[in-house]
Amino acid sequence: LYQAGLTYHCTCTRGDIRAALAAPQEGAPVIGPDGPVYPGTCRGKGHLAGAVRLDMGRAMARLGQVAFAESGTRLGTHRFDAAQLIENVGDVVLARRDIGTSYHIAVAVDDAAQGITEVTRGEDLFEATAIHVVLQRLLGLPTPAYHHHRLIRDDQGKRLAKRDDARALAKYRAEGATPADIRRMVGL
């Protein structure tokens, strides 16, 4: 991607990005799959260090449009063009100083290396899937079929996720919840 001129180095911190997005302008900052959409502050500046970002405009100029098949919550074929991805995703980080590769590039390459043909994931990763498809296409990797499922939530509507310190299903069972109670709680 670097040799194709599709990446650049970015020295912005998260604070720099928040400050740039807080500057007076029309409309509010767009929140993408990785948080606030990066405004492109370092694009074209020729920095030689910092995070490596994908220049989404150049990437999409090369690809035109990308699409993936979805069999889950948003059934159908989903197509994304340059304008949509630039506005809603921006120039995503592919590598940082502290981490050699991002989740996005890792999952695209790893799925291909393992011969994955179907991916099932939570609907909270739907927007990130477009990034993965862009990377798959740019790298000449196969694009699997995707199935995004509803998130499993507790009786208060909070999603059950380790990163949110959610209670494990085993804890509900230990407190006397039956399998039927748990199915009802998560909407099955």
Language model segments and positions:
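Extended, charge-rich low-complexity interaction segments
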Residues: 174-188
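A generic alpha-helix structural signal
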Residues: 2, 129-133, 183-186
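Residue-level detector of family-conserved "landmark" positions at structurally sensitive sites
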Residues: 11-12, 146, 182
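Contiguous mid-protein beta-loop-alpha structural module that forms a pocket-lining wall or clamp
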Residues: 3-16, 22
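Active-site cores that bind ATP or allylic diphosphates and position pyrophosphate for catalysis
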Residues: 15-161, 168-173
